Design a protein with these regions (language model features):
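Short, well-ordered secondary-structure micro-motifs
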Residues: 50-53, 104, 140
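N-terminal phosphate/diphosphate-binding loop that engages ATP/GTP or pyrophosphate donors
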Residues: 26-98
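Conserved catalytic-core segment of NTP-binding enzymes
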Residues: 127, 132-224
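Short, hydrophobic alpha-helical segments
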Residues: 112, 116, 217-233
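Glycine-rich phosphate-binding P-loop
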Residues: 11-28
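Phosphate-binding/switch loop-helix module in NTP-utilizing enzymes
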Residues: 93-136
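Short, hydrophobic/glycine-enriched beta-strand segments
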Residues: 9-14, 38-41
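Phosphate-binding P-loop
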Residues: 2-7
Length: 233
């Protein structure tokens, strides 16, 4: 039986592809270099077709519904390699068939249980950062950050389903006025079925891609994530 993991878990999701979820994780790893991060990317695929880009690729396990690999080379340019290059202590890639994520959870749990906590005290929960929306079906992480771009009309069902669980919203385009309500109205106008009521009361941070991490987001995570007791997973 996989061991129970005691960890602070930060999940980064987003409403569509190519809006900088991986880039945000890279920025967060760099912002907290002493966190001894275990980082991971979770990919679901269908019939040999990659969920990222829609083309056939080698991310689909050939014989099994799930596969998990630890990244060992920070220079390959893959997303999991980028996590290592940014300073993560360990980096993994979990792949499952579409709709079969539950079958991959024992592998994920066992991998996190085996990962060391680096220089963290033995009784301190390890710090884990994962890229996924669907993982929220199976856990309530310490923090869930949702990456949004109101000018991108595509909206994943998994992102829509869990938007009300977001602890904070990261916008990839700067609103025309410095006001949280402007961002909320943009979302409501751009995406059918997304109401501003889902976003009410949630912190909003603006970080266009390739710009520095907002300092107020760093403060938010230092207070909300690193002071949290962690969860059992």
């Amino acid at each position: 039986m996989p061991r129970t993991v005691h960890a602070r878990i930060l999940v980064v999701g987003g409403h569509t592809r190519n809006i900088g979820k991986t880039a945000l994780i890279v920025d967060l790893i760099r912002a907290f270099p002493d966190a001894a991060w275990t980082a991971g990317k979770i990919t679901q695929f269908g019939h040999g077709v990659c969920s990222r880009g829609g083309a056939a690729c080698d991310c689909a396990p050939d014989e099994h519904t799930v596969a998990l690999d630890w990244e060992s080379d920070a220079s390959t340019g893959t997303d999991s390699a980028r996590f290592l290059e940014a300073g993560a202590e360990r980096s993994l890639w979990l792949r499952t068939k579409q709709g079969r994520l539950a079958e991959g959870l024992p592998l994920l749990r066992e991998a996190l249980a085996k990962a060391s906590g680096g220089a963290l005290p033995p009784d301190c929960p390890r710090n884990v950062i994962l890229e996924s929306n669907s993982l929220l079906q199976f856990m309530r992480p310490s923090i869930y950050l949702a990456v949004l771009d109101p000018q991108e009309s595509d909206f994943k069902d998994s992102a829509r389903l869990f938007l009300d669980r977001a602890d904070a919203l990261i916008f990839r385009r700067r609103p025309p006025a410095r006001a949280e309500e402007t961002a909320k109205r943009s979302v409501e106008a751009s995406w059918l079925g997304v109401s501003s009521a889902l976003l009410a009361g949630r912190p909003v941070f603006v970080q266009p891609e390739n710009e520095p991490l907002p300092q107020d987001l760093v403060v938010f995570l230092r207070e909300r994530f690193f002071n949290s007791p962690g969860i059992l997973f």
